[in-house]
Amino acid sequence: MEPRVVKPPGQDLVVESLKSRYGLGGSCPDEYDFSNFYQSKYKRRTLTSPGDLDIYSGDKVGSSLKYSDESKHCRTPLGSLFKHVNVNCLDDELDSFHDLKKQETEEELIENDYRVSTSKITKQSFKEIEKVALPTNTTSSRPRTECCSDAGDSPLKPVSCPKSKASDKRSLLPHQISQIYDELFQIHLKLQCETAAQQKFAEELQKRERFLLEREQLLFRHENALSKIKGVEEEVLTRFQIIKEQHDAEVEHLTEVLKEKNKETKRLRSSFDALKELNDTLKKQLNEASEENRKIDIQAKRVQARLDNLQRKYEFMTIQRLKGSSHAVHEMKSLKQEKAPVSKTYKVPLNGQVYELLTVFMDWISDHHLSKVKHEESGMDGKKPQLKFASQRNDIQEKCVKLLPLMTEQLQWMPFVNIKLHEPFVKFIYWSLRQLDAGAQHSTMTSTLRRLGEDIFKGVVTKGIQDNSPQHSVENKPKTAAFFKSSNLPLRFLSTLIVLKTVTQADYLAQAFDSLCLDLKTEEGKTLFLEYQAVPVILSHLRISSKGLLSNVIDSLLQMTVESKSLQPFLEACSNSLFFRTCSVLLRAPKLDLQILEKLSIILQKLSKIKSNKKLFELFTIHLMLQEIQRTTNPEHAFLCINLNSTLFNLGLTKCNSLVSSASP
């Protein structure tokens, strides 16, 4: 940006008027030089002082200062002019101008700083004006001298003299000086106006400076606020990131929990489907059995009706044959009397060794065929062996169905047989009954089984025997055959199991379970329990419907869990689907007695120690039921809590510290 030179208003006009008035312009070569001198001097000042131009460029203050300097330069030749006019008159004006020109030229060559030289010349010119004014005005009055001196000392102050006094002063001065004075007075007024403008501009600059300071402070406050906002934004972003991470972790945790719940739901659904299929199968079997029972009832009624018809026909034919005989009535009476005691006539076999031979065969069949059926079933592989074995099993079951009524009838002869032969006979009956468990229920066997159970429970009592030979006669002495109440432990144990299989009366079953618990307290009783595979017999009564017997059933199983050599075989015998299904159904029963639950938890705790049983626990969801019972059980029931925690720990569902915490209270 180039510096801007501001000239005081009217400067060029004043200089030109002075030049024209004093004959310095135009025709005279000397005057031409004088004007050229001032022009060249002015141009040189504006071009040779870049520092001053840089300082005062583009500013009103700078322009006003330049104007004051130039006015001083204009007054310098005028001051010298006043001096030469007063001393040498007007004739020597040109010489004084030429001398002044030479003097200023020498000063400009010597001086380095233009601003210093101009200030010195200005001060010198004012002093010369004062010196010239003093001798010229000695003849005038004192007020006029004071007025002139005041005007010379303070050219920037406004003139306070009235116009009349100024006119008087002009009249006393020469005409040219008066004009110069007027022009100087006008310049003075203009300078005052410029000073006022400069003061006003300075005030505006001060206001602008204060405004800029306020804006700067406001800007600083805004910057501080922005910095605080940035800090808050960073903190908000950090908190948001933390919350986002927490949210992601929580979502992941809930996703895992949802997956576990879905797995558990799938397991429950599969178990429910399995139970539903089993229920449908049982319903189908029940319908088939009902249909078969209905057909058999119809057939039995037909047979009974036919039998009645045959009896009537036989009686009618007999009467017709004996019609002419006088003994007809007597024979009819004898026939009726013979029909009743036919079933009650007991005859002793001529050879007692036949029973011994039969008992040997019974032992052999029981030990090597009937009792081995389930073991062979578990060992079969492939479809053909299974089909072959199924046919064999059906044949065995049919034979057992045919033999059991005959065996029940033979119980009436047991009082007349050696007591040692009772055990093989009862064992054969027991294993025949066990064969019927795997097959369909036979409605025709209901009455036979009930009679068999009552005879085994009560025993057989007979008054005596009759022999056809007149040589032998036996006194009618009562004889008994005790089975359930026998003093022989193996016979009593087998009789108890038969009673549990056949009898439905609650009082008979309660006495049977009491006898079984007493027998299981001995080591021989536990061995017999395992030998005769009594677990399925006991499990048939382990249901919530028989609440009165439930405690006795659990007690009999609990006797087998006592530490002995029979414990491990008993646990292996219980490690099957039948036992775990029965326990699962029992645990689902609402409001199960606390004592029964504690006893059952002991058995489950011992079964959980076998690793292979973990699959059975999971298959029948017993572990979930135990967890639910553990959650809802009162902590005051410490024994139950300890057993549940131990069972869950063996299954790998809880940690060791849970056992310690539960046992500590």
Curated annotation (Swiss-Prot):
Phosphothreonine-modified residues are where? T48
- Keywords carried by this UniProt record: Coiled coil, Phosphoprotein
Which residues are recorded as modified (Phosphoserine)? S49, S469
What organism, scientifically named, is this protein from? Homo sapiens (Human)
Which protein are we looking at? Answer: Coiled-coil domain-containing protein 138
Which segments does the entry list as coiled coil? 198-323
Q: Which PANTHER family does the annotation name? A: COILED-COIL DOMAIN-CONTAINING PROTEIN 138 (PTHR34523:SF1)
- Family matches, as Gene3D superfamilies: 1.20.5.340
